[in-house]
Regions:
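Key DNA-contact positions within bacterial/archaeal DNA-binding proteins
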Residues: 19, 30, 40, 59
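Conserved hydrophobic/aromatic packing and binding residues within compact polymer-binding modules
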Residues: 7, 21-22, 32-35, 61
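Short basic helix-loop element that most often maps to the first helix and adjoining turn
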Residues: 5-24
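Short, charged recognition helix plus adjacent turn
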Residues: 64-68
């Protein structure tokens, strides 16, 4: 599963909007939108924070492992 699709799936499973995820990560909603479209990628710090927020490893976040 592509990275962006995985981020979107995990975000929705967590019940978060793009805006809410952006606020928790300290980025703009546009940044989250770009990540989900695979037109940009987050910094390692943001990947680590997302993995904590979603309860998955960074590897699972990057590789699109199906189980959160």
């Amino acid at each position: 599963m592509p990275f962006g699709q995985n981020v979107q799936r995990l975000r929705r499973a967590a019940g978060l909007s793009q805006e809410e995820l952006a606020e928790r990560l300290g980025v703009t909603r546009q940044a989250v939108s770009k990540w989900e479209r695979d037109s940009a990628y987050p910094e390692m710090e943001k990947l680590a924070r997302m993995s904590q927020l979603f309860g998955v490893t960074v590897e699972a976040l990057l590789n699109g492992d199906p189980a959160p």
